[in-house]
Structure formats: C-alpha cells, structure tokens
Amino acid sequence: EWCTYYGGLFEDWISQIAFDENNSLLMVGQTSSQNNIATIGAHQVNYSGGLYDGLIVCFDEKGVRKWATYYGGSGSDIFAAVQYHQQEFILAGITSSKTNIATPGANQTVHGGGVSDCFLAKFDQQGLRLWSSYFGGADLDGTYPGYPTEIYLGITLDQDGNIFMCGTTASQFGIATEGTHSPLYQGGKCDGFVAKFNNNGSKLWGT
C-alpha cells in the first residue's frame, strides 16, 4: 500500500520494526546523517557525534511520519531490536557513549567499560522516553571481539511485559546473577547471555 525512503546525506540503517494496536509502525536502527532525521520537539533533535546515533521513527498506518528522533551521546549508538507492549515500545541496542543514554535511577546508570555496552530504552507512542539503562561490564557487550560492527543482540517480552535480552558478551562481571544456570564466565573470546528485566527496567536475573 505504501513504501518510502528514509534518511539524510549519509548512511542510514534500519534494524527492526514493530507495530502497535493502531497499526502504527516503529522502526529502529542507526544513522550518520545530520539532516532529514528528527522531527521538531523530538526527544533528541540533533546528531550527537560518533560514527552513528540511534534512530527511531514512527509512521502511521498510511506511511505518514508521526515523529522521529536521534538517540545517543558522543560515541557510537545503534538500535538493534524493538518490541511493543501495552502502549509502550521497548528498544535494545549497543553504545560506546558515556552520556545521554541512561536515565536517573535506572538499573545501570554508568557505562560498564570496554568498547560497547548493551542498553535498553522504553518510549511511549508519542515518542516520550520513559526510562533507559545500560547493561554491560568492563569488556565488549552485544558485539563480537574484533568485529565491533557485528551486533548480536535481541529482545522479547512475556505477557506481563517482562523483558528478555539475549546476546554476546566478553565481560566477566556485571552480567550474570547468583543462582542462575551459569553465574560465571565460561571462557573464550565471548559467551552468550540472557537476562530478564521487569517492565521498569530492573534486572531480575542474568546468566
């Protein structure tokens, strides 16, 4: 029924899309364009720097843009996944930025170290950020060592809105919790991980 380009003068990538109950579409990804991206009054109207900023765009059911925003700090920021639940969008990505990512009181307000951390963010249908949190340790999270542009990260939600994030990590601390399948890093260049968060972004467990 419709199709559209979306982007500016430089590279623009879309990673995933999700729909709400009104058939509005939210697409997420990354951009290095400094024009034709964000809408007036959006969460972040200007490009922040680094190789990429995260990109969030919402269209209505006819393909008309409702709102769009950059997301990120002075490092590189990439959205990899998005899910919808009860009038809210949950987004996941990776970042090397030390600022402009997490909200006060979040599960992890400080970048864990290394080249990249994973992060989660929640937005409402109007583009208002509700919360955001880093998730990572002192090494690479969400990417493979030696291949920082290859992203291994996904999320899904259960019926109660709990968030499950899976991916890859080289961090030996800050990921797993006691009493889970594997609370210790098992070795090699990276391990897989899965972590559960409640709908407010608090980590319930990780392994």
Show where each model-derived region lies.
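A sequence-level/structural motif corresponding to short, flexible coil/turn segments enriched
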Residues: 1-207
